[in-house]
Amino acid sequence: MKAKLVSLLAQANIKISDQQIQQLIDLVNLLNKWNKAYNLTSVRDPQEMLVKHILDSLVVSPYLQGDRFIDVGTGPGLPGLPLAIINPSKQFVLLDSLGKRISFIRNAIRELRLTNATPVLSRVEEYQPEDKFDGVLSRAFASLKDMTDWCYHLPKENGYFYALKGIYQEDEINELNKKYTIQKVIELSVPELIGERHLIVLR
């Protein structure tokens, strides 16, 4: 698995330490183990997890501005856990409303000895953080309008929303509240992943 991950990282031009590579492998092994009992992801093959969960999360990293982020609807910690592993100086809150997902994330944080990731069991509309975030991340929302409607209270005044999407559909933009504007649409390249991936940055 290590050789495969090293190859994927090289193709994506992502440079990280040997320790971080090992943490990512350990994360996949943990997810694979828990998945058999708790059905956390439809991806069953650890090699496939490297592409669809790890690399698909990591390619967002260069575009994150700031130090404090929240991953909303994180599921089993995606993209938040991989991003926390390779960005030890940034803080990540991982929010989900399903207990089994947060239990997995707590276990992963403990096993991987991560000090910059905090799991929160809550519905997003009920979560009221003491401090707002530089960035609100999500792979979970069906539309940009849903993301901004549910998460409007989370970013700082100059904070960003980072939506990870498949195909970029312009009609989603027309549904947005006029107070939000698209800052960037970035076509992401994920090695060995079939299909389009985009990062939409708005505020």
From Swiss-Prot:
S-adenosyl-L-methionine binds at residues 73, 78, 124-125, 139. Its EC number is 2.1.1.170. It catalyses: guanosine(527) in 16S rRNA + S-adenosyl-L-methionine = N(7)-methylguanosine(527) in 16S rRNA + S-adenosyl-L-homocysteine. Pfam families: GidB. GO terms for molecular function: rRNA (guanine-N7-)-methyltransferase activity. Coiled coil: none annotated. Keywords: Cytoplasm, Methyltransferase, rRNA processing, S-adenosyl-L-methionine, Transferase. It is an enzyme of class 2 (transferase). InterPro entries: rRNA_ssu_MeTfrase_G (IPR003682), SAM-dependent_MTases_sf (IPR029063). It is found in: Cytoplasm. Specifically methylates the N7 position of guanine in position 527 of 16S rRNA. Belongs to the methyltransferase superfamily. RNA methyltransferase RsmG family. This is Ribosomal RNA small subunit methyltransferase G. It comes from Haemophilus influenzae (strain PittEE). The lineage of its organism: Bacteria, Pseudomonadati, Pseudomonadota, Gammaproteobacteria, Pasteurellales.
